[in-house]
Amino acid sequence: MNKVKCYVLFTALLSSLYAHGAPQTITELCSEYRNTQIYTINDKILSYTESMAGKREMVIITFKSGETFQVEVPGSQHIDSQKKAIERMKDTLRITYLTETKIDKLCVWNNKTPNSIAAISMKN
């Protein structure tokens, strides 16, 4: 009987930790990183530029408001686990631009110029 109570208590504690451990919104996700801030965009991407030129390999997006953001194209400065995520973000932005999907919010690192995208939230 005591074993069952301990198991139930442990399961309840573990479940509550797991439920609160993963961020549920872009705001919660962004708060986990230093040098980040949330930009509320609520607009379509006005321009999409992809550069493969040497040290400036990146995707740059701009909005009507004039806000400009970047995603670096994976290079030698990135570890393998980062490269796939960066490629996915680049692909997501390209598709978002081509389908004219609205970007709701961006979480960006504000210690780079232009600000570098860490996370994206979209809506139709």
UniProtKB/Swiss-Prot annotation:
Indicate whether Hydrolase appears among the record's keywords. Answer: no
Lineage: superkingdom: Bacteria
Give the disulfide map: C30-C107
Q: Which GO terms describe its biological process?
A: killing of cells of another organism
Indicate yes or no for the key word Signal: yes
A Pfam family annotated for this chain is Enterotoxin_b
Spell out the protein name for this chain.
Heat-labile enterotoxin B chain
What is the source species?
A: Escherichia coli
